Amino acid sequence: MDEAPRRWYGWDAGRLLVIDIGGGSLEVAMGSDEDPTVALSVPAGAGRVTREFLPESGVADDDDLEAARKNIRKILEPMVKSFPKSKHPMHAVGTSKTIRSLARLAGAVMRQPGRVDTSIMTIDQLEDWLPRLAAIAPDQRTALPGVTPERTYQIVGGGLVIDEIMKALDVKEIEICPWALREGAILRWLDQFGRTRLGF
């Protein structure tokens, strides 16, 4: 499991489901400790899905979105089957910039006072925004909160992937973690450096 979310939420945070989407792949990990019980990656990144399954113009109607969703579900199917079923809800955490952008756009609510930059995005909020966002030309999306120029073209594709993996794993809401892979790499380096300097 990416170490950054585990450090951010604390080692007693329980079972974490960590979702990270990049341009080319979607990575999902689940576990209760630093090492994940399951950690998988599939070729369903925001950029890849946009290029392969959405109109070149960047604008998509309901039929386009449903066709893209069907393709995404096929890609996600092996991943979903690998995750154990449980009656206990998982603490779902999103770590990527795409997820943070979507959460800001969707109006994610703040929770747990005292924790910096903590926000929650529900699947209903995400699904409410996706068709509206898809109907807007990419060059006009930067006027919306949370949509940065480098993600304006692929944010719909990323949103579809996040929506589909949340539905498949029965995740109703996702907490946005301000730390991502880069911070996790730094933490691992600091741990290794500290052990080396201290001789253990």
Q: What are these model-derived regions, one by one?
A:
Residues 24-30:
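Acidic, divalent-metal-coordinating active-site segment for phosphoryl/phosphodiester hydrolysis
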Residues 19-21:
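Catalytic cores of RNA-modifying enzymes
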Residues 1-15, 30-200:
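Helical "lid/coupling" subdomains associated with nucleotide-phosphate turnover
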